[in-house]
């Protein structure tokens, strides 16, 4: 996983060049948006349990067979595993958002996830749906539009961060499908 600074250094080093020009400008923008990025990650991690439990509840409401005998969320052990997986996915999305780089998702979360779910008989459509619900909830926190929950936000538009976070959730969802 490379953060924005490491990426610039590695790229410049590969070219045997000093860091400068557009690379410095991109780092300057990254720093200027740093407080918004930190706030966005804080909103997600502060509400992680709510985001994950709402996503799993929504997934179950849309597919009640998941909690029927034989369903993948039937028994406390399976429900706990489902919630745990949601927490892990959300945690890695927050890491990616903090770093401004999705490689942590590829390296530590998504590599083999679909194959594992298939081997365990986990319905990938339901898992993907839970991820899309997490996406909607998390991005609402980032833009401070989550119903019933308003927080003090850093000044400025957070649409770019919302789109970035959404792209990470989309990456997770498409890797499961």
Curated annotation (Swiss-Prot):
Keyword Plastid set for record: yes
GO BP, one annotated term: photosynthesis
CDD domains xref list: PE_beta-like
Domain of life, source organism: Eukaryota
Modified residues (N4-methylasparagine): 72
Locations listed in the record: Plastid, Chloroplast thylakoid membrane
Binding, phycourobilin: 50, 54, 61, 147-148
Post-translational modification: Contains two covalently linked phycoerythrobilin chromophores and one covalently linked phycourobilin chromophore.
Cysteines paired by S-S bonds: none
Keywords attached to this entry: Antenna complex, Bile pigment, Chloroplast, Chromophore, Electron transport, Membrane, Methylation, Photosynthesis, Phycobilisome, Plastid, Thylakoid, Transport
Main location: plastid
One CC-aspect GO term: chloroplast thylakoid membrane
Gene3D superfamilies, A to Z: Phycocyanins (1.10.490.20)
Membrane topology summary: Peripheral membrane protein
InterPro entries reported in the protein's UniProt record: Globin-like_sf (IPR009050), Phycobilisome_asu/bsu (IPR012128), Phycobilisome_asu/bsu_sf (IPR038719)
UniProt: (2R,3E)-phycoerythrobilin 1 binding residues: 72, 77-78, 82, 84-85
Binding site for (2R,3E)-phycoerythrobilin 2: 35, 39, 158
Family membership noted in the UniProt record: Belongs to the phycobiliprotein family.
Its job: Light-harvesting photosynthetic tetrapyrrole chromophore-protein from the phycobiliprotein complex.
Name of the protein: R-phycoerythrin beta chain
Organism: Griffithsia monilis (Red alga)
């Amino acid at each position: 996983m490379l953060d924005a600074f490491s990426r610039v250094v590695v790229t410049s080093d590969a070219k045997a060049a000093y860091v400068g020009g557009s690379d410095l400008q991109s780092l300057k923008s990254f720093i200027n948006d740093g407080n918004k990025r930190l706030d966005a990650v804080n909103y997600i991690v502060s509400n992680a349990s709510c985001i994950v439990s709402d996503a799993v509840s929504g997934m179950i409401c849309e597919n009640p067979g998941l909690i029927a005998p034989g369903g993948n969320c039937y028994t406390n052990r399976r429900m706990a595993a489902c919630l745990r997986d949601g927490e892990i996915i959300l945690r890695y999305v927050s890491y990616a958002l903090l770093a401004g780089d999705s490689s942590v998702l590829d390296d530590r979360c998504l590599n083999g996830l679909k194959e594992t779910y298939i081997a365990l008989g986990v319905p990938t459509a339901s898992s993907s749906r839970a991820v899309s619900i997490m996406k909607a909830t998390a991005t609402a926190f980032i833009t401070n539009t989550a119903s019933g929950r308003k927080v003090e936000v850093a000044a400025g538009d957070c649409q770019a961060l919302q789109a970035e976070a959404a792209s990470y959730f989309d990456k997770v969802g498409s890797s499961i499908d």
